[in-house]
């Protein structure tokens, strides 16, 4: 089953557009986990198990694992999701951006080592930086387009032949680069007008939307701007607001409650 097939099935099965981001910061873990060697895996797996029926995808951020020499725990986490919660796609948030043999190795890392179902990619270097990932026909490739950070406007709003750079990325990603139908785009919840513009350009191409929760993006504006005609088309990511909802041994239950509330808030506007 391809990433897009999994995503479509998860949207329907779980009645959810929520993506839970897995950005584990041990400094914020409950005290009972802090001394354990595999605390990053244990924390993330508990969050996953508590929320898997409420989400359309999970998105581990590779830097949070690599910075603590915990890549083996990331491998174990993705394997855990695939084994215990089959059908929920895993997006490796790596934002790689290179070309040629280096990009090929990054694709091997994402899809063969970590066995992610999709990966985020920086398309700044053009099609050469995307093609190595598209060589895996069952995998998803999610390109940065209009990012949620304020500084994104420094480049993404530059005029390129009568359109903004982020619009050009959207046009390429939904057109000539996407003959295999594997590409999705990152568009930040902090900019709902741009979400609507990207949706206008790309049709039903899925959008990964960070920026709700701790970053302050508005759920109603996001959903109304980005939903497709059938009320799907979005992976609306929340990380910190869910991960760190609880401070004690019941942290996973607290995370579930916030995830449930977030999913239901999203569904109000579908």
From Swiss-Prot:
Its EC number is 4.1.1.23. Pfam families: OMPdecase. It comes from the Bacteria. Keywords: Decarboxylase, Lyase, Pyrimidine biosynthesis. One of its GO terms (molecular function) is orotidine-5'-phosphate decarboxylase activity. GO terms for biological process: 'de novo' pyrimidine nucleobase biosynthetic process; 'de novo' UMP biosynthetic process. The keyword Metal-binding does not apply. Pathway: Pyrimidine metabolism; UMP biosynthesis via de novo pathway; UMP from orotate: step 2/2. InterPro entries: Aldolase_TIM (IPR013785), OMPdecase_AS (IPR018089), OMPdecase_type-2 (IPR011995), OMPdeCOase_dom (IPR001754), RibuloseP-bd_barrel (IPR011060). The active site is at 95 (proton donor). It catalyses: orotidine 5'-phosphate + H(+) = UMP + CO2. Belongs to the OMP decarboxylase family. Type 2 subfamily. NCBIfam families: pyrF_sub2. This is Orotidine 5'-phosphate decarboxylase. It comes from Dechloromonas aromatica (strain RCB). The lineage of its organism: Bacteria, Pseudomonadati, Pseudomonadota, Betaproteobacteria, Rhodocyclales. The gene is pyrF.
């Amino acid at each position: 089953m391809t990433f897009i097939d999994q995503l479509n099935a998860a949207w329907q099965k779980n009645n959810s557009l929520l993506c839970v981001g897995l950005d584990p910061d041990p400094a914020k873990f409950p005290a009972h986990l802090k001394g354990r060697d595999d605390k990053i895996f244990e924390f993330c797996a508990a969050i996953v198990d508590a929320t898997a029926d409420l989400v359309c995808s999970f998105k581990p951020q590779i830097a949070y694992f690599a910075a603590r020499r915990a890549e083996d725990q990331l491998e174990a986490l993705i394997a855990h999701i695939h084994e215990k919660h089959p059908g929920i796609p895993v997006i490796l948030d790596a934002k790689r951006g290179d070309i040629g043999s280096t990009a090929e190795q990054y694709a091997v890392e994402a899809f063969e080592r970590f066995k992610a179902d999709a990966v985020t990619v920086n398309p700044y270097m053009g099609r050469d930086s995307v093609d190595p990932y598209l060589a895996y026909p069952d995998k998803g490739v999610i390109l940065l387009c209009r990012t949620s950070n304020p500084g994104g406007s420094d480049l993404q709003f530059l005029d390129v032949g009568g359109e903004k750079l982020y619009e050009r990325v959207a046009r390429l990603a939904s057109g000539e680069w996407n003959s295999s139908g594997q590409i999705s785009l990152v568009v930040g919840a902090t900019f709902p007008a741009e979400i609507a513009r990207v949706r206008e350009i790309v049709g039903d191409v899925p959008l990964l939307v960070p920026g709700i929760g701790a970053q302050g993006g508005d759920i109603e504006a996001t959903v109304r701007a980005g939903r497709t005609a059938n009320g799907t088309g979005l992976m609306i990511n929340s990380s910190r607001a869910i991960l760190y909802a609880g401070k004690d041994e019941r942290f996973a239950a607290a995370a579930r409650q916030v995830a449930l509330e977030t999913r239901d808030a999203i569904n109000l506007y579908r």
